[in-house]
Amino acid sequence: MENYNQTSTDFILLGLFPQSRIGLFVFTLIFLIFLMALIGNLSMILLIFLDIHLHTPMYFLLSQLSLIDLNYISTIVPKMVYDFLYGNKSISFTGCGIQSFFFLTLAVAEGLLLTSMAYDRYVAICFPLHYPIRISKRVCVMMITGSWMISSINSCAHTVYALCIPYCKSRAINHFFCDVPAMLTLACTDTWVYESTVFLSSTIFLVLPFTGIACSYGRVLLAVYRMHSAEGRKKAYSTCSTHLTVVSFYYAPFAYTYVRPRSLRSPTEDKILAVFYTILTPMLNPIIYSLRNKEVMGALTQVIQKIFSVKM
């Protein structure tokens, strides 16, 4: 067992990019993805805010998803870019705690928000006459507020524990951000009790919401199958397939990473999987929701036409 480090409290993030041409290529690719995510999510938020036809619970939830994704990727990538450009892979003890807190908060909030969006589609398709009551503005705000509060409390508990455990002399985190499970490998104490709480937390905030989402869309698909209108059936299938694509792309790598015991995990595999839910998903969400949505594309076309008409 290693000795405690009494002189330095900084961590070292080993990162994702090797110092080679391949590393430069991966860095450039991720930086471009980051820019696309910023532009896409900001555009989605502004579009929903500006177009009065999109002022509905469904699009309000979608704007919150874009807001979460915008902050989510901004919590991770700027530090990666700085480390690669300046060759400084260190992160302060406090900085690591802050990054971990925001990552966990945004990750859980997105999962809960996706569950709310699934419930919204379930009510809209299965109980259309009850929709204004079940998904009122007040209910919508409560779901969003609840998602943020629950995720913040959960994140605070995990981050405080991670910052309070004693760490060994080696402070090199084999990851590209301060991921709590990766930090636990550096601990100079037995963390099996905490690892059990991580498994429990992952089950509560990953497996249970995904089960709820699957049940909601199962009911939706059954209701859609019974529809007489071909146009309505096509629109409902399009909406559901869009949401299921987002959910699967987000939950699958996340659950596979956090629900597995440490003995079955590898740092390289964890880093690759983390790219999906921290970098790719925030970039893909606005693209998937806009390209498969006639209302969003129509609103985007109107905004572009207004901009060009003003310039003319």
UniProtKB/Swiss-Prot annotation:
Superkingdom as given in the UniProt entry: Eukaryota
MF (Gene Ontology): G protein-coupled receptor activity; olfactory receptor activity
Glycosylation sites: 5, 88
Localization: Cell membrane
Extracellular side: 1-24, 79-99, 158-194, 259-271
Bilayer topology annotation: Multi-pass membrane protein
Cytoplasmic side: 49-56, 120-138, 219-235, 292-312
InterPro entries (UniProt xref): GPCR_Rhodpsn (IPR000276), GPCR_Rhodpsn_7TM (IPR017452), Olfact_rcpt (IPR000725)
SUPFAM superfamilies: Family A G protein-coupled receptor-like
SS bond list: 96-188
Entry keywords, A to Z: Cell membrane, Disulfide bond, G-protein coupled receptor, Glycoprotein, Membrane, Olfaction, Receptor, Sensory transduction, Transducer, Transmembrane, Transmembrane helix
GO biological processes: detection of chemical stimulus involved in sensory perception of smell
Membrane-spanning parts: 25-48, 57-78, 100-119, 139-157, 195-218, 236-258, 272-291
Gene3D superfamilies: Rhodopsin 7-helix transmembrane proteins
GO annotations of cellular component type: plasma membrane
Assigned protein family: Belongs to the G-protein coupled receptor 1 family.
UniProt-listed PANTHER family: OLFACTORY RECEPTOR
Function: Odorant receptor.
Listed name of the protein: Olfactory receptor 2L2
Lineage: Eukaryota, Metazoa, Chordata, Craniata, Vertebrata
